[in-house]
């Protein structure tokens, strides 16, 4: 019966009430045990053992859960209070501060208000240095105190640098401008505590002095370039014999030649040309195992006096090698034979031997004029003439013509050419080539002038090239800038022809 207490609806309740009334009757009806009726009367539904036990278990479980939750919340708040609450941390940090004078200065409210006065005292700067070191690792120091200390140290650093650093030359100011400013605690001015020797020297340890490194690197680069270009000197003399119409070249001696052999010496000799004629090649004797040879040899070049102004003297110094190709030491090119005198008497000349790996070939020169009309956007190149061109045919002549290419960003936009002049090394053209170029595009274009040799059977060969434009070098850039500076006026110049090292690279020949 106890298992069904509280179950069912009104009928069950009515049945239970009837059973309870029967049990209370005296004597009980037949079929009912007296002990059963007593237990039924003494244990009402709300006091049954099973119901009491289940209620007690649920209550105990709820109490345990509540207690555990309260404990976890208490632990969480305790940890938060210990770790994150700033007033407690300031209180804990202030307890050992009495042992540290720097901390007392930085933590006391009065010191914060009078920090500017205390910074002026030299005796407090020792504590400031410790405070700066602490501020890099501990967040206990307030931000405004740290900022004031840093500003004071930076101000003293600048004053100390201005008074103790030597003035550097203007040669290195551009390099120093790119170096970052660094603050060092050791560079603080300590007043009269430092000895005079220490006050005279910069106290910022670890600072880079760019003038030392740059001076060394500049000197090293200059020495390296001089060593690369210096190949000794050569002494020769020139004299013209008017009776025989002969130019007499006397090779006297060479001095301080570079060593080409493993034993530290060379076997030098000299080749002599009177350009543009390369067929007449003269050569000195070979001098063995010496870097300062004495030649003292005369060489005769038959040439009319009127042609001397168009001739160049080319001296090539070689090292003789019996078993392999002769090594070139360097060369000397004398463009003006009348540089030293009028050649009526013998004149001694000293020249530096220029470094060269192979004999430079005189390809000739071309003369042309440039004229630009900004309003019409028209560029006119007039090919006037060429002289002393290189002979490309077996007959000793060439069939030259000039090809002009308009280049923009490495691409060839247009090309035009002159007529062909047969069997000549000094052609005269006087032909105009016109290109339409807007003024806003003049900084993006250049002209490539190629002197070609016409061949009826095979491919036409390039004798030499030159280039004018903003991206050109030397005379090519100067000629272009002069044309832009004087519009509507033809500007004419002679240009030397150069070899093409590589035919085409991205549409542009390399000179």
From Swiss-Prot:
Residue span, C2 domain: 230-351, 362-495
Comp. bias regions, Polar residues:
160-172
What are the entry keywords?
Calcium, Cell membrane, Cytoplasm, Cytoplasmic vesicle, Disulfide bond, Membrane, Metal-binding, Phosphoprotein, Repeat, Synapse, Transmembrane, Transmembrane helix
What ranges does the record list as Low complexity composition bias? 93-103
Which residues hold Ca(2+) 4? 393, 399, 453, 455
Q: Which residues carry this modification: Phosphoserine?
A: 217
Looking at the UniProt entry, the stretches that span the membrane are 60-80
- Location, primary (coarse class): membrane
SUPFAM superfamilies, sorted: C2 domain (Calcium/lipid-binding domain, CaLB)
What's its membrane topology? Answer: Single-pass membrane protein
Does the UniProt entry include the keyword rRNA processing? no
Residues at which Ca(2+) 3 binds: 321, 324, 327
Domain of life, per UniProt, equals Eukaryota
Q: Name one GO cellular component term.
A: synaptic vesicle membrane
Q: Does the keyword Cell inner membrane apply?
A: no
Q: How does it assemble?
A: Isoform 1: Homodimer; disulfide-linked via the cysteine motif. Isoform 1: Can also form heterodimers with SYT3, SYT7, SYT9 and SYT10. Isoform 1: Interacts with STX1A, STX1B and STX2; the interaction is Ca(2+)-dependent. Isoform 2: Is not able to form homodimer and heterodimers.
Q: What is this protein called?
A: Synaptotagmin-6
Protein species of origin: Rattus norvegicus (Rat)
């Amino acid at each position: 019966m106890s298992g069904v207490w509280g179950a069912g609806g009104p009928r069950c309740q009515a049945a239970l009430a009837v059973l309870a009334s029967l049990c209370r009757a005296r004597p009980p009806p037949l079929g009912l045990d007296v002990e059963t009726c007593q237990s039924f009367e003494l244990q009402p539904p709300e006091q049954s053992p099973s119901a009491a036990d289940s209620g007690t278990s649920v209550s105990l479980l709820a109490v345990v859960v509540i207690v555990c939750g309260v404990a976890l919340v208490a632990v969480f708040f305790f940890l938060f209070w210990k770790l994150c609450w700033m007033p407690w941390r300031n209180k804990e940090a202030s307890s050992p501060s009495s042992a540290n004078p720097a901390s007392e200065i930085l933590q006391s409210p009065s010191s914060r208000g009078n920090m500017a006065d205390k910074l002026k005292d030299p005796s407090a700067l020792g504590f400031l240095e410790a405070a700066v070191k602490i501020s890099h690792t501990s967040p206990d120091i307030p931000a405004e105190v740290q900022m004031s200390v840093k500003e004071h140290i930076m101000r003293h650093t600048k004053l100390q640098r201005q008074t103790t650093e030597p003035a550097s030359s203007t040669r290195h100011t551009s390099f120093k401008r790119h170096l970052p400013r660094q603050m060092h605690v050791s560079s603080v001015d300590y007043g009269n505590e430092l000895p005079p020797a220490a006050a005279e020297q910069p106290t910022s340890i670890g600072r880079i002095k760019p003038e030392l490194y740059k001076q060394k690197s500049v000197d090293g680069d200059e020495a390296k370039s001089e060593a690369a270009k210096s190949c000794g000197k050569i002494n020769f003399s020139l004299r013209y014999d008017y009776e025989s119409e002969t130019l007499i070249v006397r090779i006297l001696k060479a001095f301080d030649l570079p060593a080409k052999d493993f034993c530290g010496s060379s076997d030098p000799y000299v080749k002599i040309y009177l350009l543009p004629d390369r067929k007449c090649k003269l050569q000195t004797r070979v001098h063995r195992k010496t870097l300062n040879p004495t030649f003292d040899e005369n060489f005769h070049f038959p040439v009319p006096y009127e042609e001397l102004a168009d001739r160049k003297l080319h001296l090539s110094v070689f090292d003789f090698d019996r078993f392999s190709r002769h090594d070139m030491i360097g060369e000397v090119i004398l463009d003006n034979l009348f540089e030293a005198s009028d050649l009526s008497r013998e004149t001694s000349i000293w020249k530096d031997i220029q470094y060269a790996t192979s004999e430079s070939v005189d390809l000739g020169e071309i003369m042309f004029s440039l004229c630009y009309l900004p309003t019409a956007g028209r560029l006119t190149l007039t090919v006037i003439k060429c002289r002393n061109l290189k002979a490309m045919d077996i007959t000793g002549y060439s069939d030259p013509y000039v090809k002009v290419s308009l280049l923009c960003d490495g691409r060839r936009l247009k090309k035009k050419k002159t007529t062909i002049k047969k069997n000549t090394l000094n052609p005269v053209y006087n032909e105009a080539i016109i290109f339409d170029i807007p003024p806003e595009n003049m900084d993006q274009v250049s002209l490539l002038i190629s002197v070609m040799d016409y061949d009826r059977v095979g491919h036409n060969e390039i004798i030499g090239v030159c280039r004018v434009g903003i991206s050109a070098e030397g005379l090519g850039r100067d000629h272009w800038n002069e044309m832009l500076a004087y519009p509507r006026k033809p500007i004419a110049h002679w240009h030397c022809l150069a070899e093409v090292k590589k035919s085409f690279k991205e549409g542009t020949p390399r000179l």
